[in-house]
C-alpha cells in the first residue's frame, strides 16, 4: 500500500462498489476467487481475468457471471518479461501491446467497446477476439513450445 498501487482491500463491503474487476492471479485462483465472490459483484460490473490460459478460466467464470448477472470477459495481455512480482512492474508495460479477449458472445459490439474503453488507460495497441480454445492453442505454439524446446535442448547431451 505504500507504493500507492493498492488503494484498499476487496471485501464484502468494497466488491459491490466496483465497476471493473481485473483478476490478475493464476488461472485456478482467478476462477476460485470469482466462484467464491461472484455473489458480491454488482450486476453492472465488468470482470476480466488476465491469465495466460483461457479454457479453464472461461469454463468456470462464464457460468458464475450468468448466475449473478454481471459480465465476464476472458482477457490476456500479450506483454511481459521473464521476471514476475510487483518489484518488476512498470507503468508502461502494456503500452502498444496487444490484448486478446474471449467474450461470452462474439456479436456484442457494445461489450467489446466497453472492454476497450475500460482498458484504455493501459495503452494497449490493439485488441483481438477469439475463443478460449483457439487462444490456448495459439499460446501453446507461440509461447509455451519455445520454452519446452529450449529446455530440451539445454538438457540434451
Segments predicted by a language model, with ranges:
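Short, flexible, solvent-exposed loop/turn segments with mixed acidic/basic and small polar residues
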Residues: 87-93
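Internal alpha-helical scaffold of NAD(P)-dependent oxidoreductase catalytic cores
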Residues: 93-157
Amino acid at each position: 500500500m505504500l507504493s500507492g498501487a493498492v488503494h484498499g482491500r476487496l471485501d464484502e463491503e468494497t466488491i459491490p462498489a466496483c465497476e471493473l474487476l481485473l483478476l490478475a492471479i493464476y488461472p485456478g485462483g482467478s476462477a476460485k476467487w470469482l466462484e467464491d465472490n461472484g455473489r458480491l459483484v454488482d450486476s453492472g460490473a465488468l470482470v476480466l481475468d488476465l491469465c495466460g490460459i483461457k479454457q479453464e478460466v472461461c469454463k468456470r467464470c462464464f457460468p458464475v457471471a450468468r448466475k449473478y448477472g454481471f459480465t465476464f470477459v476472458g482477457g490476456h495481455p500479450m506483454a511481459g518479461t521473464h521476471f514476475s512480482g510487483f518489484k518488476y512492474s512498470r507503468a508502461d508495460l502494456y503500452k502498444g501491446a496487444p490484448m486478446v479477449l474471449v467474450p461470452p458472445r462474439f456479436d456484442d459490439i457494445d461489450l467489446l467497446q466497453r472492454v476497450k474503453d475500460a482498458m484504455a488507460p493501459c495503452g494497449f495497441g490493439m485488441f483481438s477476439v477469439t475463443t478460449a480454445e483457439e487462444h490456448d492453442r495459439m499460446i501453446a505454439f507461440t509461447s509455451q513450445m519455445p520454452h519446452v524446446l529450449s529446455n530440451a535442448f539445454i538438457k540434451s547431451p
